[in-house]
């Protein structure tokens, strides 16, 4: 396509150009806005809100279809865009000392239009989000900013939240440890920061609430997703599931593990690494059945197939220190994209239990799904969705087809001068690792910082051992608990002179790597070093009491070791220099003042983290503790900055940060994220990938051609080969994998779309009952439809009355409605036409309902409404759970329809629809039955003035 671009220009450049006139308007307003006082600047928000409200006056937005609602809001906001962006730019300059560059204004416009902005590492994505967030919050309908972990959500809400608060908007933050009331309060804010999982689980929990007071979220409006590729692509196949515990057949998992251990690969079973699946051969079935003393693994009375297949998968496809680690008698999943551990996350369908049996740890209970949704369908609930990432263009087609999101590449503020060197491929793993270690040693000799990306915990430790042999000091960042708790600290100093950092999957790491080191972060760590021992409650686990839950696997989280926060302090070598005596004295005085004001050993760790975060920013504050800490923070920062600035210049002369990739990832995007760690904001840098024929990508997706070349030329194990053919083969392999996984995600989306339509319908019905919107009318509908279904089951309108099954009809109706006992006569009913019969029975059923309503409300006013709400919610929840299981079973077996020349997806849609209709029939019938049958107990109030002497 290069000739096309030369002829017509780069389409991305053309896209960006259309925003230039708007940016020119904003720049023209800059001097005028800068002349405003703080109060005048803040008052602009109320002016904008009124102008937007005037535009929307008389429009019932909630009554509009989603696309029309978004269009109306965008038209209203269009009149204030340039002024609003100019105001946010000035506020950021005053409050946090950052001014939006023109390219960041373009990024803000792209996000406001509901697109994905591709912005390179270090280009200030976090700051860009303040622009569209402020603008869209002017409607009062709320904005959600989504990050990949709690730490980033908290950091961004504290840091960027200062800009919004300065301008008079409220800022909310959703964290794992919050109570429902705290969540509701934070969701009610103008702008709310949170993680994708917390927002998704809150949505599911809201749709399991038993009274309206438990709801925490309001209607969705606008969402900005940071690291959008990580959430909408990498996590797309992972559903959010809320489940309940069911009994575990632990002995079956243990026995199946023994069978899997005895079975041999390629004899008893075959492994498809590409599909991540296993298949038993005929010999395998026979051997397994003999070992288990059963005639059939699929026997309904004593099924074993599910357990054996999972045990073989656990043996062959799930490796310790790659897909999971073992900690505190638990199997803890490692996120393959970020390298973080995920306590509380479990593989479903018995797979986690199979891995527990393999590792001989306690086998935990199985779970039953109560509610679930994929990220794909969750984020499509927002009328307007936008995202930011450093790498999106490689997935542009997927974003367009599944999410209807356009991708626009935002130009960098300074030209990228990084050198990306060609890949080196080695015959063996050992040859590759030796060469990586040699390259690190060469760079380290000159003091040039090196960042090495690995794909698993196991491989990071192999390299770490090699570097120890060579006497090269280095930092290790992987999912092991002892490394995770120092994550930000390790990344913050990765650009120091002579620094060597080994990291497992750098995607999504939130701290910038600055050449020479990050003085701001180091100054914050210095405050942490002295404040935590003085202020934090003794023996409080990392991130407060909730962290204990995370480390026991009872909740979801981002993996920190259960180490006392007082002990989890930065190592001394991170600091660039010893502080001067006067600064040390000033620091001691600030800590003493904080202790005097707040109390020794009295604060939760999160509270102290927040104190340090606010002290290190520039927002206005009246808090004397923060004022003292801010003063000393600035003094420490200045001393550290002298050293880091000097180191920065030295590292630039050496060539900047050198990034080494030790394996090509399945997605080019993740490789690009690793490369993007070098050469940020115009700094020099270089990258190189070292590969071997044993790497998963080459081994599974077409390394035979390269292996053949190496054999033909008798290449030694420590001799690398570089060639255009090789690079092309690797890129083709990655494209194959990307296409393969895209097809899988597309299939997940298509199948979940069936569930999504059902989910929307059932949740809407549930919300109608929960919020009590005329429950009597809902129940009358249920009665009407239930009687209709019973009549049609026994009466064929095209047949004469003599052929109607009237005795059976009467029996069914009297079982449903006891008040109709002895009220129905088959002879009289036979005199009606089918239509008249139906109308007569419906009117009798409704009369019986009104009689019941009068009787029940006489016991306690409005008791009937409460009963209706309870029975509707109870039946929807119970039958929806059963329906989810049925749909899972249908999904598992529907693929076999392909062998019968039928489209499995169409079959799934049709049969799933039938199951859903049947569930709705059961919900209605069960609710009607319960309302006609339940007997409330009458408990008369006791008159305290009356005491019967007989009982004294």
Curated annotation (Swiss-Prot):
Keywords: ATP-binding, Cell inner membrane, Cell membrane, Cytoplasm, Membrane, Nucleotide-binding, Protein transport, Translocase, Translocation, Transport. Its EC number is 7.4.2.8. It is found in: Cell inner membrane; Cytoplasm. It catalyses: ATP + H2O + cellular proteinSide 1 = ADP + phosphate + cellular proteinSide 2. Its main location: membrane. Monomer and homodimer. Part of the essential Sec protein translocation apparatus which comprises SecA, SecYEG and auxiliary proteins SecDF. Other proteins may also be involved. This is Protein translocase subunit SecA. It comes from Gloeobacter violaceus (strain ATCC 29082 / PCC 7421). The lineage of its organism: Bacteria, Bacillati, Cyanobacteriota, Cyanophyceae, Gloeobacterales.
